[in-house]
Amino acid sequence: MRGFTYLSKVLHSHSSYSKLLVLCSVSTGGLLVYAESNVESGKQVVEQNQPESKKKRVVVLGTGWGGTSFLKDVDISSYDVQVVSPRNYFAFTPLLPSVTCGTVEARSIVEPVRNIIKKRSGEIQFWEAECLKIDPENRTVSCRSGINDNLAGQNDFSLQYDYLVVAVGAQVNTFNTPGVMEHCHFLKEVEDAQRIRRTVIDCFEKSVIPGLSEEERRTNLHFVIVGGGPTGVEFAAELHDYVYEDLVKIYPSVKDFVKITVIQSGDHILNTFDERISSFAEQKFQRDGIEVSTGCRVTSVSDHFINMKVKSTGKHVEVPYGMVVWSTGVGTRPFVKDFMEQVGQEKRRILATDEWLRVKGCSNVYALGDCASIDQRKVMEDISAIFKAADKDDSGTLSIEEFRDVLEDIIIRYPQVDLYLKNKHLLEAKDLFRDSEGNEREEVDIEGFKLALSHVDSQMKSLPATAQVAAQQGTYLSRCLNRWDQCKSNPEGPRHFKSSGRHEFLPFEYRHLGQFAPLGGDQAAAELPGDWVSMGHSTQWLWYSVYASKQVSWRTRYLVVGDWVRRYIFGRDSSRI
């Protein structure tokens, strides 16, 4: 006993010895478990890790793309950072469709949050809990832990903040369609992908039970995907490969009964992509036997049937199914809706921010990713102030030189101006001043200036709800906070047109780096900057390299690539676990 006590003290003082001892024990076939538990000392550690500090407290809600990218770059020597999330990991969500069919394992695409924050040279507090309410007036968030339910009254807690970062993503939007919540699968979380994987196997197992009619087998093996966006299309492609590369080999008696259908309310699938990609995807799905029903809207879902309306004819169709995956629309989480009501945004569908990601209607609260949308200010709302600021000599007219002097600030503050100039192929400021007949003008009055910019706001577009947008926003916000004091004294943003001075920071600017659409059969489509489109087998290898490089850690990168190799050699696993 004394020997164990001495050994315990040595291992506690020299952690490297304990690691070496564990390694040696495992390598020789033994198993050593060394642990020290002291509740009281644990409480003291928590107290010591939370000293009174003059650092501003930043509370981050969410560990998705926006929250994680913010945590990786924020200066924790300047801020007391605390993170609240109901999941203690980051998930590489673009690979969720691959998880549904076993191409990639679930644990290969997740990285524990504590692994991410421990790499920072400082301390970030993480609380595995769900946010229940935001109180912007008192600058507090109310949270509830989903663990330790036996500790009555100790699951709820609140945190005060100086700055709040809301990066909680979105939940599924059913558009109040009857039966969707009860009968459909979703694909937003890792758990969703795992449930889909089990259900696919269940459908096949049910279909080989003796005594079933052909109609019953066809119904069980009819897989329906509602939504023809990137998630729905990629899942349909993954499922097709899983079925025809793996499952038909072990369920050969029912291979002729399998059917995959994609229901899309729009005229084409992948309608946010280039038309060439959309057309290529539809043609490939047709060759693969995947049915694409465009121009159809689902009106209700029962336990065995989907009811949909064909827009062109107005006819209602009843479709039997074995499994439905709902992959369309994003909705707002309940506590975010409550927060929106508090800040006067109750009529909006999604949380509104300005171009600096600040939530409108309150101070010191920022929102990133799918839970928010940038409410870009319109040029025509400030047209008089812009004209007055540009008219330096107060002549009542604006010369080309005066306009050119403020054009850079206008483009930064109102990015739709730059889009308008490019789309209209207007190379210089003077091109905006041309009259209706195309003649050049040296100067314009306020009415002429309004006419010149009257169509600019038509170029405004909402940012897509993608991981790429959220990640860039998280990085942008962290860099703004890191340079807060510097930019307060030396502003680097565009000029204030309605007042004097400049904005402290440049507004957020999204840089589209391209998007992929895996289409199955080791083929993919890519849309990259510069109107460059690529489709086929070579694009699939580009997809592999990009997605491997974008993994959050070397551990997940190794696991994901290993899963791809395993699938090529051994195929996908069909076990129901």
Curated annotation (Swiss-Prot):
Pfam families: NDH2_C, Pyr_redox_2
Regulation: Activity is calcium-dependent with a more pronounced effect at higher pH.
GO cellular component, one term: peroxisome
Cofactors, names only: FAD
Keyword S-adenosyl-L-methionine assigned: no
Major location category of this protein: mitochondrion
Coiled-coil stretches: none
Membrane topology: Peripheral membrane protein
Span of chain positions assigned to the transit peptide in the UniProt entry: 1-35
Cofactor details (free text): Binds 1 FAD per subunit.
Keywords: Calcium, FAD, Flavoprotein, Membrane, Metal-binding, Mitochondrion, Mitochondrion inner membrane, NAD, NADP, Oxidoreductase, Peroxisome, Transit peptide
Catalytic reactions on record: a quinone + NADH + H(+) = a quinol + NAD(+); a ubiquinone + NADH + H(+) = a ubiquinol + NAD(+)
Family designation: Belongs to the NADH dehydrogenase family.
Protein name: External alternative NAD(P)H-ubiquinone oxidoreductase B1, mitochondrial
Organism: Solanum tuberosum (Potato)
Gene behind the chain: NDB1
